[in-house]
Amino acid sequence: GLAALGKEVALIEGHHVGGDCTNVGCVPSKTLIHLAKNFKNGANPDEVLQETIRKRDFLRDKETEEIKEIENLTFIEGMAKFSAAKTLDVTNSAGETQQITAENIVISTGARPHMLNIDGLPAERAMTNIDLFDLENAPKHIAIIGAGVIALEMAFALQKIGTKVTMFALDKRALMTSIPEAAEAIQASLDKKGIATYYGATAKIYDEASQTLTLTQGDAEITVDAVDKVLVAIGRVRNIDSLGLEQAGVKSDPRMGILTNAGGETNVRGVYAIG
């Protein structure tokens, strides 16, 4: 990248090196899918989740070491916020803040999972894909909200290691953005594996004492018993709300996010947004 070309680069990261792909996306999800594919009856499902974590952490640690060794690159742990057009305040986990000024700033903060508040559902039972890949013990029965790619990947993988899976979504079918033929094939596979699906349904309330999740589907109520985890996989939200874009004068749109030209540059010269 730029550091290899001799440019001085400060890389600011608020969580873990590698972003979504290494930590909560491609790497752990495909690892879990691979391990689940080879899961044998009678094996310990907890070991599958723990091995997924080990492999993810190994790669993350390796990437972190490599990043810190790059010449001309300074790695800074913390959350960045604009205080002016070319100035960032970076606050680390200890609450310490340093100020960084640069002629060029590239915003690449990605997105986070959208979360739902379900009446009665304790925080420790609610998950997104971020929490899922830190889970060391397999749920006995997981309710998955959503019917997109992430929801389906996790439904099939967890079912394969012995977790009972119930999946429901407000959508009319699985994979709403795909062609109907693909959705039909997926639905046939869900049915074959005993994964219960409810479409046009929403979560109404969770009862902790009985671990019962109540859904509404039109005028009907559906009771899903003995649910110990709920995975929310209903889309993502841009990580731009805490960047202080107003202080920098960077224009954004509620629907489009940060506005850029074809070269990724915002309305503020030298400030770029690439994803």
Predicted regions and their residues:
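Glycine-rich FAD pyrophosphate-binding loop
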Residues: A3-T22, I161-A174
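Rossmann-like dinucleotide-binding cores of NAD(P)H-dependent redox enzymes
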Residues: R54-T64, F133-D134, P139-A143, V149-L215, ...
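N-terminal Rossmann-like dinucleotide/flavin-binding domain of flavoprotein oxidoreductases
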Residues: C21-A102, T177-A201, A209-S210
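Conserved N-terminal Rossmann-fold NAD(P)-binding element of oxidoreductases
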Residues: I12, I107-T109, I145-G146
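Core beta-strand elements of the Rossmann-like FAD/NAD(P) dinucleotide-binding domain
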Residues: G95-N104, D219-K229, N267
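Glycine-rich active-site/cofactor-binding loop and its immediate structural neighborhood
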Residues: A84-K86, V90-L116, M127-N129, D134
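FAD-site-proximal beta/loop scaffold in flavoenzymes
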Residues: P122-A138, D225-G275
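Conserved Rossmann-like nucleotide-cofactor binding loop
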Residues: V17, R112-H114, I150, R173
